[in-house]
Amino acid sequence: MEYKSSPKRPYLLRAYYDWLVDNSFTPYLVVDATYLGVNVPVEYVKDGQIVLNLSASATGNLQLTNDFIQFNARFKGVSRELYIPMGAALAIYARENGDGVMFEPEEIYDELNIEPDTEQPTGFYEAVDKPKKREEKKKTKSVSHLRIVD
């Protein structure tokens, strides 16, 4: 019987994050911006990746869960809410000396990065604020059944 363990990535990410912060390093996160569900400022994406500063001074409401990383950050003075599924986290390292870790591929994250067969909103924002427009029925002119009587 094969034992299925939970993914290592969230635990390693949190451990390295804590170690970097405890040693006064600036934690940088490398993100696969093409991964399904990623919400980052696309104007800063380069070669499908973005590097994000996770320091306390650069982020607000930072959450490092087993499934995702979420926080607020400012880009050119504009506040943005970022959402990174754990499968999109590629590496975490210190800005000052590059010390850190690249995460090994894990099968579960490959499975989660597959587009669903049916089109569904990816989040509450899309479902509520950007509803799909209903296709309007095209009105066709029909010949009137009325006629002019003299």
Swiss-Prot record:
<dbReference type="GO" id="GO:0005829">
    <property type="term" value="C:cytosol"/>
</dbReference>
<dbReference type="GO" id="GO:0005840">
    <property type="term" value="C:ribosome"/>
</dbReference>
<protein>
    <recommendedName>
        <fullName>Stringent starvation protein B homolog</fullName>
    </recommendedName>
</protein>
<comment type="function">
    <text>Enhances recognition of ssrA-tagged proteins by the ClpX-ClpP protease; the ssrA degradation tag (AANDENYALAA) is added trans-translationally to proteins that are stalled on the ribosome, freeing the ribosome and targeting stalled peptides for degradation. SspB activates the ATPase activity of ClpX. Seems to act in concert with SspA in the regulation of several proteins during exponential and stationary-phase growth.</text>
</comment>
<feature type="region of interest" description="Disordered">
    <location>
        <begin position="114"/>
        <end position="150"/>
    </location>
</feature>
<comment type="function">
    <text>Also stimulates degradation of the N-terminus of RseA (residues 1-108, alone or in complex with sigma-E) by ClpX-ClpP in a non-ssrA-mediated fashion.</text>
</comment>
<feature type="compositionally biased region" description="Basic and acidic residues">
    <location>
        <begin position="127"/>
        <end position="138"/>
    </location>
</feature>
<comment type="similarity">
    <text>Belongs to the SspB family.</text>
</comment>
<comment type="subunit">
    <text>Homodimer.</text>
</comment>
<dbReference type="InterPro" id="IPR036760">
    <property type="entry name" value="SspB-like_sf"/>
</dbReference>
<dbReference type="Pfam" id="PF04386">
    <property type="entry name" value="SspB"/>
</dbReference>
<dbReference type="InterPro" id="IPR007481">
    <property type="entry name" value="SspB"/>
</dbReference>
<dbReference type="GO" id="GO:0045732">
    <property type="term" value="P:positive regulation of protein catabolic process"/>
</dbReference>
